[in-house]
Amino acid sequence: MSSTETYEPLLTRLHSDSQITERSSPEIEEFLRRRGSTVTPRWWLKLAVWESKLLWTLSGASIVVSVLNYMLSFVTVMFTGHLGSLQLAGASIATVGIQGLAYGIMLGMASAVQTVCGQAYGARQYSSMGIICQRAMVLHLAAAVFLTFLYWYSGPILKTMGQSVAIAHEGQIFARGMIPQIYAFALACPMQRFLQAQNIVNPLAYMSLGVFLLHTLLTWLVTNVLDFGLLGAALILSFSWWLLVAVNGMYILMSPNCKETWTGFSTRAFRGIWPYFKLTVASAVMLCLEIWYNQGLVIISGLLSNPTISLDAISICMYYLNWDMQFMLGLSAAISVRVSNELGAGNPRVAMLSVVVVNITTVLISSVLCVIVLVFRVGLSKAFTSDAEVIAAVSDLFPLLAVSIFLNGIQPILSGVAIGSGWQAVVAYVNLVTYYVIGLPIGCVLGFKTSLGVAGIWWGMIAGVILQTLTLIVLTLKTNWTSEVENAAQRVKTSATENQEMANAGV
């Protein structure tokens, strides 16, 4: 990755019999610039194949990482669910309501790493990337300190939110066991985004797979053999996340792939932190408003009559929806890197091509997943519980799950485009209005003022997602990608200048 090498974003030399697929990103950019509106459908198809190969080379491993990270909590809840319906409700409310809030903050803050590091990588400003990652870690650890109090006092908080005493008690036990996990989040999220921005995704996938397999074995031992209950399961979850931090950190420190982007720890990470902090806040608000929206559905469901059944049913549906979300977040991370790399490299037309191809791809995938959910809904319900009443309640909600899965094929991808382009602040306002001013109130009215119950809450929230998705589509269609290249160049230039000034000053 020396400065003398010709830069080509991502994997740009793919072997194919088709001439177009042998071209680099700058060559494709020049082709699109010259041909413009005269590009024929035959050539658009070849361009789509070219982009799809790049996208899947990157997103395949990104999806594995995203899904396996989520599966750590998924497997934990599956094992605790067989301890009893009350334990399942407690673990679910702690995982969704408490851990989900913390993870939303950490993941949202880390999306700023994707924006700045991705654009810096595209512009070949490699030395600034390690400093950006360290700044992110500092801010994440500071946030983790404040979140610790949320975990420790989760019982009273859950009761204040209307959860029953029994569910709040079980949830507090589980949440306190996850306190070490918060600090693991604070380090793992920036490190993974730092590696993804450099297109280092296969090693991340291997590390995540190894940790997941060990986690599954340890969780089974703790819950089924040693009978350590909820607390034991939560502590194993925390341990697994720290193991993930350890292997990710060792890779960054020891791998030759990071020798130009990670030049060691530096006090420069503490300087010039304010501009990055502002982007971090916008990123956190944007993604948190999305993640908490679904978590709110679970929490509000606990306020209905017969809360244990309602909470178990919606929690199981949310776990499947979140599994699908992790799949789409893997694609979202890939498109974020694609867009940020291409904007940083000055290829606006290739960035736009990436956006179109990934959206067509995800809509097709979501359509297939909808059919699978509807056909196998009873079997999928039994994976979590043997309670006949809960199974029936879950099966009744699966049509709504199918609708949400289809929307997942569009909304997270457009959010990934926003992250790659640095639009976090704008999307944060969109999320606030469509989700919390419109969708959530409609859901509460339908859930509590009609006989629809939890289905009514979900329908209202689906309305919010539809409005948000339509807004993002309009925003994307109206984007001037040439201007976005200029914005990316200015963002990278500012970061690089700050780092160079501090280096010259001996900081």
UniProtKB/Swiss-Prot annotation:
Which keywords are on file for this protein?
Antiport, Flavonoid biosynthesis, Membrane, Transmembrane, Transmembrane helix, Transport, Vacuole
Cellular localisation: Vacuole membrane
Q: Which GO terms describe its biological process?
A: flavonoid biosynthetic process; maintenance of seed dormancy; proanthocyanidin biosynthetic process; xenobiotic detoxification by transmembrane export across the plasma membrane
Cytoplasmic-side segments: 1-62, 114-137, 192-202, 246-283, 334-355, 411-425, 475-507
Record InterPro entries: MATE_euk (IPR045069), MATE_fam (IPR002528)
Question: What factors induce this protein?
Answer: Positively regulated by the TT2-TT8-TTG1 complex.
What tissues has this protein been observed in? Expressed in reproductive tissues, from buds to siliques. Restricted to the endothelium layer of the ovule and the seed coat.
Membrane topology reported for the UniProt record: Multi-pass membrane protein
Q: Name one GO molecular function term.
A: transmembrane transporter activity
Pathway info: Secondary metabolite biosynthesis; flavonoid biosynthesis
Q: Does the keyword Metal-binding apply?
A: no
Q: Explain the consequences of disrupting this gene.
A: Pale brown seeds due to a strong reduction of proanthocyanidin deposition in vacuoles of endothelial cells.
Q: Does Transmembrane show up as a keyword for this record?
A: yes
Superkingdom of the source species: Eukaryota
Task: Spell out the GO cellular component terms annotated for this protein, sorted alphabetically and separated by semicolons.
Answer: plant-type vacuole membrane
Transmembrane intervals: 63-83, 93-113, 138-158, 171-191, 203-223, 225-245, 284-304, 313-333, 356-376, 390-410, 426-446, 454-474
Topology check: give the Vacuolar ranges. Answer: 84-92, 159-170, 224, 305-312, 377-389, 447-453
Q: PANTHER family this protein is in?
A: MULTIDRUG RESISTANCE PROTEIN
State the protein's purpose. Acts as a flavonoid/H(+)-antiporter that control the vacuolar sequestration of flavonoids in the seed coat endothelium. Could transport the anthocyanin cyanidin-3-O-glucoside and epicatechin 3'-O-glucoside in vitro.
Q: Which family does it belong to?
A: Belongs to the multi antimicrobial extrusion (MATE) (TC 2.A.66.1) family.
This protein is called: Protein DETOXIFICATION 41
| Organism the protein comes from | Arabidopsis thaliana (Mouse-ear cress)
Name of the gene this protein is made from: DTX41
